[in-house]
């Protein structure tokens, strides 16, 4: 008789090899064809909502690992919240306006911007953006992200643009919108403003100069020893041509500055830079007369060295960006020619001088000496003039990375031009208070955005481009007065509802304005339109109003925003500002931020370095579930590492989790809910109640409850790496290495319908059910595969994603039982080490070939005695004997109260279960079997 065929061996069609790249598309098709997202929403209609508002990715390229991380984090949260009973509508979005798309469209399509009328260019951009929306949508869906993919929000949609106009109008009517000056990147060769996306950096040789600025107001800080001598602040600049626009000198408030005697004069500069400046300028700067903290010089004054500027004052201001990395610690400040200079200028209400025209030539405002010179050609003349005036302390040429126009490859400049702004001062206090009402995850995000909003200056919201939502302002042809009010905003918004923002270029001002509109200043009836468009951050910053507040399935304010940590400066802030300005509160109740994706060494990914990993390649090799597992395994609060080795390790973790589940499926193969076969395990009638289970099975279910507690807490606090480690440990250590290994004999060798086997099967089924729900938000494809393989009641949900969250069964938790088994597991690991040593020494083959004598005393003795009846089974040996006290020749363990002797098992080996026993041979009908196995095969 072939006794192997009488064993209850595991049997399942659930494949050992996942084959995720090939199988996952089948589940995408299943979810889509069966409208699982729609059915989920219908099932939870009327439940409390949890709205996670999607930060719109930019529609101009393939998704990268940062996109994948972000979308999967959102998906994990939404799937968990659904299982907890929430109504979880998820509307994905896209950002589709702005310069990157405009330039990408021009470049890809080979267009000449100057030869296209605005509407033609806009239509090209429109089509280009939607093409990338489709590509990205498919990539996001491939990651297993569930949402309303057929009805996303897109910033170029008519309804979105109309609502954006209304947000702008509300802010304007409250007095928060005004026109002023702002420095922008400017290409003198292309004669156009540029965005950061339109610049690239290249090496350039630049003359740097150390300039003596006569100090005329010292705040009483000049040391006694320096009084009576001519004093100068020494500034440093890499752009000598901007000297005509100098209106301030910036110091770091915390730096120590020195008053130094040099050649009969007193020079003021950072103490830590004296040696460096002295070496470059060939000056002895060792005679320090005194020191002053930067903050004590705030509002002191210098005078511009050029006499033709009529003693124009240069204010001493404070700026944290001033460092001792280079220069003098006294920074030349020209708000008309620098972004940080401009911000400093706004803070101190400095004049914004910009004596440069659109072609990069210095104007009359720079003085007759420099008028008409191209900016970079003026560097040497400025340097020579300063030398003539005895105001040049020194100079040197340096090579550094400098911004160039991506189009013409020439160096660019900063240039102040007229722009539209949102005034933050009008609602700054409200915004800061609103920040305190939001939950920030991690908590440091609160202080970060608080500092940014507290320190930020007015928001420049205009761009000199065509592809975007226009600034809805009209100008009177007669007097130049600008016109924007509730009536004009309503009219423009209504046009946009019908035709989109193309209407601004397709219709005249008179057509767009309400009939009978006249200039409130002069009564004029003819108008022209503003040519600037809005900053794309105003687009996405209006999305909470245009989407969450408008779509009936959503709600406002939303429960959560979730994006990368760079969005404290970006979308989190633009959304906060528009929301507070319009509605008086933050648009979100919580904000979660994650770090950047970097390589395995913590370096930024770069094509030139060759360390770029893209989601598409990972999916082809491993499948999307491995990316999802990587997302959950990462502590996203810091930068998140990824590398081929990390992915390989995660694939191994995935394999272990999958094998644990497969083992349970295989050993519950006779399980069913509705069956007439008496040999099958009918869960309704054959499940063993908890209090009747074998104690080891009770232990397993108790640990399942503890796992549920830990995993639920981790989901609630968004600490997904905690639940990853908890489930991984549960599957590999508590289940595979301990519980499932021990019950193998019970499952295989006991009669199929024995209580011992049914007890284990009941426990395993409950473990499997809870595991697939806990893992479904992370391993969405694999858990769907498991669910489809499982035998279920007729009324079971068609998708694993519809299952409710498993409740913790507190009655299963017994501290005494937990302590008992935790203590035994610790002792068992010591015994297992000795058995492994015996195996390596060829003393035994399999552990069932062994008899162990356990020489124990004290605590170890008590623990072993508590499980003495099942000790051999628990150790997976044929015999286990407890001997009180120590023994000569026994193998020492990591415990002083336990030694182990391993010997060959006594008796004969049962052909069916492989356990050695004196009972083998006692049954004449089955002489090679032990008593238990003989009884099992007779039935």
Sequence positions of predicted segments:
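Short cysteine-rich clusters marking metal-coordination/redox-active sites
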Residues: 187, 405, 476, 519-522, ...
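N-terminal catalytic cores of NTP/NDP-binding nucleotidyl/phosphoryl-transfer enzymes
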Residues: 42-104, 155, 164, 235-243, ...
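Protease-associated
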Residues: 248, 255-330, 339, 343
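Residues immediately within or flanking Cys/His clusters that coordinate Zn2+
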Residues: 184, 402, 473, 516, ...
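Cys/His-coordinated zinc-binding microdomains
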Residues: 191, 464, 480, 523, ...
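Residue patterns forming the tRNA-binding/recognition surfaces of aminoacyl-tRNA synthetases
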Residues: 2-13, 17-20, 26, 30-34, ...
């Amino acid at each position: 008789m072939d006794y192997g065929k009488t064993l209850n061996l595991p049997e399942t069609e659930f494949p050992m090899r996942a084959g995720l790249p090939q199988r996952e598309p089948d589940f995408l098709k299943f979810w889509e064809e069966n409208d699982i997202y729609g059915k989920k929403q219908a099932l939870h209609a009327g439940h409390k909502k949890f709205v996670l508002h999607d930060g719109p990715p930019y529609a101009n390229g393939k998704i990268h690992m940062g996109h994948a991380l972000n979308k999967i984090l959102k998906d994990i949260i939404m799937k968990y919240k659904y299982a907890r009973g929430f109504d979880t509508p998820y509307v994905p979005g896209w950002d589709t306006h702005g310069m990157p798309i405009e330039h990408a469209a021009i470049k890809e399509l080979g267009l000449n911007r100057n030869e296209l009328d605005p509407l033609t260019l806009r239509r090209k951009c429109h089509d280009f953006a939607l093409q990338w929306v489709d590509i990205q949508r498919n990539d996001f869906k491939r990651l297993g992200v569930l949402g309303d993919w057929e009805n996303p929000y897109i910033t170029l949609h008519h309804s979105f643009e109309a609502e954006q106009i209304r947000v702008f109008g509300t802010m304007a009517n409250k007095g928060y919108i005004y026109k002023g000056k702002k420095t922008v990147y400017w290409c003198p060769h292309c004669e156009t403003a540029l965005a950061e996306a339109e610049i690239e950096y290249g090496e350039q040789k630049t003359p740097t100069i150390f300039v003596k600025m006569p100090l005329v107001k010292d705040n009483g800080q000049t040391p006694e020893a320096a009084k009576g001598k001519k004093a100068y602040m020494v500034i440093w600049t890499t752009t000598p041509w901007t000297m005509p626009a100098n209106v301030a000198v910036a110091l770091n408030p915390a730096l120590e500055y020195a008053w130094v005697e040099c050649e009969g004069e007193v020079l003021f500069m950072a103490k830590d830079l004296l040696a460096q400046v002295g070496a470059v300028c060939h000056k002895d700067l060792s005679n320090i007369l005194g020191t002053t903290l930067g903050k004590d010089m705030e509002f002191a004054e210098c005078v511009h060295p050029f006499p033709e500027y009529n003693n124009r004052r240069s204010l001493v201001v404070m700026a944290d960006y001033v460092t001792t990395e280079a220069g003098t610690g006294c920074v030349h400040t020209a708000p008309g020619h620098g972004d940080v200079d401009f911000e400093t200028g706004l803070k101190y209400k400095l004049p914004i001088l910009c004596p440069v025209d659109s072609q990069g030539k210095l104007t009359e405002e720079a003085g007759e000496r420099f008028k008409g010179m191209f900016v970079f050609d003026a560097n040497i003349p400025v340097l020579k003039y300063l030398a003539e005036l005895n105001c040049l302390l020194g100079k040197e040429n340096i090579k550094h990375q400098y911004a160039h126009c991506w189009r013409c490859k020439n160096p660019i400049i900063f240039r102040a031009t007229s722009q539209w702004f949102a005034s933050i001062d009008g609602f700054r206090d409200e915004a800061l208070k609103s920040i305190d009402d939001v939950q920030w995850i991690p908590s440091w995000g609160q202080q970060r955005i608080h500092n940014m909003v507290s320190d930020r200056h007015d928001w420049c919201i205009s761009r000199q481009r065509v592809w975007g939502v226009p600034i809805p302002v009209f100008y009177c042809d007669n007097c130049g007065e600008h016109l924007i009010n509730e009536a004009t905003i309503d009219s423009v918004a209504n046009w946009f509802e019908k035709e989109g923002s193309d209407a601004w270029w397709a219709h005249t001002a008179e057509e767009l304005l309400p009939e009978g509109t006249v200039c409130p200043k002069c009564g004029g009836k003819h108008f022209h339109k503003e040519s600037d468009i809005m900053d794309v951050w105003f687009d996405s910053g209006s999305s909470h109003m245009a989407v969450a507040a408008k779509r009936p399935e959503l709600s406002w304010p939303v429960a959560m925003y979730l994006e990368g940590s760079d969005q404290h400066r970006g979308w989190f802030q633009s959304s906060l500002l528009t929301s507070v300005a319009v509605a008086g509160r933050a648009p979100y109740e919580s904000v979660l931020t994650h770090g950047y994706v970097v390589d395995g060494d913590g370096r930024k990914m770069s094509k030139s370095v060759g360390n770029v990993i893209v989601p598409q390649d990972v999916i082809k090799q491993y499948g999307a579930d491995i990316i999802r597992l990587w997302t959950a395994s990462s502590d996203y609060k810091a930068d998140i590492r990824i590398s081929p080795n990390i992915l390989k390790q995660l694939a191994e973790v995935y394999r272990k989790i999958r094998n644990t589940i497969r083992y349970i499926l295989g050993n519950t193969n006779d399980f069913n809910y509705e069956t007439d076969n008496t040999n099958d395990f009918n869960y309704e009638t054959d499940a063993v109640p908890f209090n009747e289970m074998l104690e080891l099975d009770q232990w397993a279910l108790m640990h399942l409850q503890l796992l549920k507690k830990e995993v639920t807490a981790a989901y609630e606090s968004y600490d997904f790496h905690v639940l990853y480690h908890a489930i991984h440990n549960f599957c590999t250590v508590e289940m595979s290495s301990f519980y499932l290994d021990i019950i193998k004999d019970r499952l295989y060798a006991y009669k199929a319908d024995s209580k011992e086997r049914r007890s284990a099967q009941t426990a395993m089924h409950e473990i499997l059910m809870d595991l697939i729900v806990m893992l479904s938000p992370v391993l969405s494809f694999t858990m769907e595969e498991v669910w489809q393989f499982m035998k279920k009641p007729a009324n079971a949900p068609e998708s694993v994603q519809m299952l409710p969250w498993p409740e913790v069964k507190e009655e299963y938790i017994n501290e005494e039982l937990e302590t008992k088994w935790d203590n035994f597991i610790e002792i068992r690991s010591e015994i297992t080490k000795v058995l492994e040593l015996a195996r390596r020494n060829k003393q035994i083959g399999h552990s069932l070939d062994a008899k162990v004598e356990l020489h124990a005393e004290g605590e170890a003795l008590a623990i072993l005695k508590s499980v003495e009846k099942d000790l051999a089974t628990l150790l997976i040996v044929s015999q286990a004997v407890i001997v009180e006290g120590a023994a000569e020749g026994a193998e020492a363990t990591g415990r002083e109260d336990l030694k182990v002797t391993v010997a060959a098992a006594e008796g004969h080996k049962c052909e069916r279960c492989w356990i050695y026993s004196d009972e083998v041979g006692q049954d004449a009908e089955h002489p090679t079997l032990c008593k238990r196995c003989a009884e099992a095969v007779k039935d």
